[in-house]
Amino acid sequence: MTGSIWAIVPAAGRGTRFGGPLPKQYLPAGGQPLMAYTLAALAAHPALAGIMVAIAPGDADWPGWTAVQSTPVLTCLGGASRAASVLAGLLALPESVRADDFVLVHDAARPNLALADLDRLLEIGRGDPVGAILAAPVRDTLKRAGDDGGIDGTEPRERLWRALTPQLFRRHQLIRGLTEAAAAGVEVTDEAMAMERMGLRPLLVEGAEDNFKVTTPADLARFEFELVNRGLGARDPESAHPQSSVLASAFSGPGSRVSGPEEI
């Protein structure tokens, strides 16, 4: 599998639910910024041609990475929402990326992506005309709450899944979906929702339960605990988490190009 897929990583958010002055994607974990593990997990797959990171205007915390594991890293200016940042990333991709090429979108603060899950998503998703997302079946019992905090009922869970990332779609279809949602004033919470609004049905590809998004201090502590259990990520070829020193040496920079909307 040759490098042909670009990944968009929206990283312009401030992570207000996490608290603190530093955006969660830059919080240290195992001696490296959290997002370093995210980008390394993507770059570990041979199908990756490059990564476009959408950052906030004036982001002083961006390390200026230009490559990870020889995979190019570019940046563009993100927007006020996740959807706006993803759209900016799609429009800022190099001219070599065609309209009907598949593009990945992955959360900046989802560092625990397994290489096997990414491989399965690409294998299944690229065989579908629409694309696919990583997801996990809902296993807990779901309760519907009333206005008073009491239980109004139990919801069937048999056909419910939790959406994860990465999500894989054709570039032109995702641009259209995000553009139409924005024009309609609809806030889409993931890329699949934008596709669904157009009547398209992406595939669900089961991913690991530990591909979690870091949104709270407890989530960060969980990821750090996993790194410790792995010897700060000392890994065999199947793991996506290099040892901290190895991870640091995998990144090149500073001096990453930052393109604004006026360059698109």
UniProtKB/Swiss-Prot annotation:
In terms of InterPro entries, this protein maps to: IspD (IPR001228), IspD/TarI (IPR034683), IspD/TarI_cytidylyltransf_bact (IPR050088), ISPD_synthase_CS (IPR018294), Nucleotide-diphossugar_trans (IPR029044)
Where are the annotated segments for Disordered? 234-264
**Single GO molecular function:** 2-C-methyl-D-erythritol 4-phosphate cytidylyltransferase activity
The metabolic or biological pathway listed in the UniProt record of this protein is: Isoprenoid biosynthesis; isopentenyl diphosphate biosynthesis via DXP pathway; isopentenyl diphosphate from 1-deoxy-D-xylulose 5-phosphate: step 2/6
Keywords of the record, alphabetical order, are: Isoprene biosynthesis, Nucleotidyltransferase, Transferase
Respond yes or no to whether keyword Chloroplast is given for this record.
no
Q: Which residues form the signal peptide?
A: none
Q: Where is this site: Transition state stabilizer?
A: 17, 24
Query: What would be one Pfam family of this protein?
Result: IspD
**Swiss-Prot/TrEMBL GO biological process terms:** isopentenyl diphosphate biosynthetic process, methylerythritol 4-phosphate pathway
Site positions for Positions MEP for the nucleophilic attack: 157, 213
Reactions mediated catalytically: 2-C-methyl-D-erythritol 4-phosphate + CTP + H(+) = 4-CDP-2-C-methyl-D-erythritol + diphosphate
Q: What is its EC number?
A: 2.7.7.60
State the family it belongs to: Belongs to the IspD/TarI cytidylyltransferase family. IspD subfamily.
User: NCBIfam families of this UniProt entry?
Assistant: ispD
Q: What does this protein do?
A: Catalyzes the formation of 4-diphosphocytidyl-2-C-methyl-D-erythritol from CTP and 2-C-methyl-D-erythritol 4-phosphate (MEP).
The protein depicted here goes by the name 2-C-methyl-D-erythritol 4-phosphate cytidylyltransferase
Question: Which organism does this record belong to?
Answer: Xanthomonas euvesicatoria pv. vesicatoria (strain 85-10)
**Corresponding gene?**
ispD
